[in-house]
Amino acid sequence: MGEVTAEEVEKFLDSNIGFAKQYYNLHYRAKLISDLLGAKEAAVDFSNYHSPSSMEESEIIFDLLRDFQENLQTEKCIFNVMKKLCFLLQADRMSLFMYRTRNGIAELATRLFNVHKDAVLEDCLVMPDQEIVFPLDMGIVGHVAHSKKIANVPNTEEDEHFCDFVDILTEYKTKNILASPIMNGKDVVAIIMAVNKVDGSHFTKRDEEILLKYLNFANLIMKVYHLSYLHNCETRRGQILLWSGSKVFEELTDIERQFHKALYTVRAFLNCDRYSVGLLDMTKQKEFFDVWPVLMGEVPPYSGPRTPDGREINFYKVIDYILHGKEDIKVIPNPPPDHWALVSGLPAYVAQNGLICNIMNAPAEDFFAFQKEPLDESGWMIKNVLSMPIVNKKEEIVGVATFYNRKDGKPFDEMDETLMESLTQFLGWSVLNPDTYESMNKLENRKDIFQDIVKYHVKCDNEEIQKILKTREVYGKEPWECEEEELAEILQAELPDADKYEINKFHFSDLPLTELELVKCGIQMYYELKVVDKFHIPQEALVRFMYSLSKGYRKITYHNWRHGFNVGQTMFSLLVTGKLKRYFTDLEALAMVTAAFCHDIDHRGTNNLYQMKSQNPLAKLHGSSILERHHLEFGKTLLRDESLNIFQNLNRRQHEHAIHMMDIAIIATDLALYFKKRTMFQKIVDQSKTYESEQEWTQYMMLEQTRKEIVMAMMMTACDLSAITKPWEVQSQVALLVAAEFWEQGDLERTVLQQNPIPMMDRNKADELPKLQVGFIDFVCTFVYKEFSRFHEEITPMLDGITNNRKEWKALADEYDAKMKVQEEKKQKQQSAKSAAAGNQPGGNPSPGGATTSKSCCIQ
């Protein structure tokens, strides 16, 4: 068989298309595609402009896909697309303008410039300091970015949008232009522009189609780059907020340390060579001694810039963070005006206007005087700058953060502005923490000062203590110089006899005694309870404490020291005479009597409701039991003073228990809580009757802390209301004092609150006092003393006292009712007589049928 020629094979394949296709797919298709994808360069001749064949165009597309797959550098991928487009469009050169927003203004900046079919990337890549920037209202590229549509300009000289300043800079003549936006959704990302058609007078419709077709590659590249960049920025932003947040909440006391910790921690995510933070002086008003020299003409007035809220711009501290080379941090207190971060005037400008300033080419900047030479031995120079204010929640500028030289050499862009603004905004808001801490610290210091002032006026001084502890008279020395035995000897002579003054009796009256004598009686009660020696109470501290308590009560009508003492005396009587002491330890008895003496200290003569209505600070401080909690805190404040602390020698557990008992006892005097606890107390009384022996019940109660606390709470109520159980001669006088204080509150409600008081506090209804007293006894008081007399029969005298006083008040109430009834009857008779007299007047008789008669005429 002879050799087969190429012509014969070609003829055979043309005649058998199906076989040719099958053979090709089986033997060559995979290899061909593999060769195409594996080829490093497309087999297309780019040396001369010519119309590519379909095969060449396919190879170009494969080349672009391969390049996009292998190359992660955005500029290089776009550069390759533009080189291919130069050949396909037969354009002399092409350029890429990136869309960005700087200082809130959109603009286009050259990124790839003068790309042609034989260009090298390094020659076409525009460095940040060599950028050509177009605003959107300038040039054809600005018009394309604004309209978001392709533009084909056949003749630039006839186009109104064309601007020749680039031609002047480059000494190049632009004749025709084909430009198109690269979009990401509805947003412009970049503008790609081809200039000067090589083989024609202008770009054709065919060129537009080619540009749009290959623009899909550029669009995809830019979209991937843009999404990757956004992802990177958001990741950095999240890390910055996370780490700065963690450091902000570590440091709540000082703004400088707070800023430093946050800014130093996030330094790796800021993507810049240096950043500087200037902290502004927050003083709004100068001291008079600083103003006088200005007013006297000795010092010129300040004429520099001011913050939007009127403060002089004075950076009291600058912190420099140097991240290039060897990391360093420099803190400059009271920086001079020529400090490298301030000398340009940019931080002051930002502080004055509150604007974000993004400067892409600092050496070429005319408005700000940036240093154009290296700042230090490292040769570092300022290239681009981003500066923004740090604003707190009050919209006051507290500082300025300035970032220098983005690490990749590009100028700071919109995403950098957003990222840095998030950081500075967070730092500004976090200023609230140290501000709040400082305010709280000042309030705490003021509170301590005021407490010191109060204690100075309330505490028993060295002259007053000599009225009881007469150490100067007896020993010729001060109390603290005496031994406890010497003080005990003086007190034994000075303190009253318990039996003589009847301080353990339920019918005790304070009226014949002076306030100083009441203080002495109070001291004697501690000795009667035998707690002074047992708990090693310093006798000087005991005397000072009781005397200070008497001074702590205000000089008001009823809730004064006499009332405070009476409550303490009744507590003492319930424990001793009422035999309730057997349920409580000596420590608890000490705490209960002390709480009773303290229970109304610093009372203002008005009740809790008035504190709320008048919006008294006490009402804002304490949510419930307002005055009771204030009395408790006042008493604790006195006890915290070493010279007054009668609990100073208790161990920790004893001290905590004593304070706990005082807390319950004083809060329990709130009558609003009385109705909640009396049912529980009644159950305890009922339970006590189920025990056969008193000893078993006592042993049970001593171990039941909750029941003991309920009994103590009811004891405090019984003590607080004990004036109602006193002999009539005493009770009638005390009731008038209580009523007078109520009427004073009623007057305040009328004058201050512009409200009508309740009848109990209305002095215009003073005659109704007996009736109100009967109601108060029946509704509030009787239950307490009836249950206590049932609980312990030794307390029956208190029930007898209230029963007798009710009779007296009831008699007065009946007398008042009878008097009012007589007055009402008399008034009715007078009205009847007046009506009868009016009926006998002419024209006064009613007309027939009930019609009203005329006063001026009558019908005959």
Swiss-Prot record:
Chief location: membrane
GO terms for biological process, alphabetical: cAMP-mediated signaling; retina development in camera-type eye; visual perception
Record keywords: Acetylation, Cell membrane, Cell projection, cGMP, Disease variant, Hydrolase, Lipoprotein, Membrane, Metal-binding, Methylation, Prenylation, Repeat, Retinitis pigmentosa, Sensory transduction, Vision
InterPro entries in UniProt: GAF (IPR003018), GAF-like_dom_sf (IPR029016), HD/PDEase_dom (IPR003607), PDEase (IPR023088), PDEase_catalytic_dom (IPR002073), PDEase_catalytic_dom_sf (IPR036971), PDEase_CS (IPR023174)
Gene designation per UniProt: PDE6A
Annotated spans, Disordered: 821-860
Catalytic reactions on record: 3',5'-cyclic GMP + H2O = GMP + H(+)
Cofactor: a divalent metal cation
Membrane topology per record: Lipid-anchor
Biased composition range(s): Low complexity: 830-851
Binding residues annotated for a divalent metal cation 1, in chain numbering: H563, H599, D600, D720
Organism: Homo sapiens
Record EC number: 3.1.4.35
Chain sites annotated for binding a divalent metal cation 2: D600
Source species, domain of life: Eukaryota
Family the UniProt entry places it in: Belongs to the cyclic nucleotide phosphodiesterase family.
Location relative to the cell: Cell membrane; Cell projection, Cilium, Photoreceptor outer segment
Oligomeric form and interacting partners: Oligomer composed of two catalytic chains (alpha and beta), an inhibitory chain (gamma) and the delta chain.
Ranges for domain PDEase: 483-816
Name recorded for this polypeptide: Rod cGMP-specific 3',5'-cyclic phosphodiesterase subunit alpha
Domain called GAF: residue spans: 73-222, 254-431
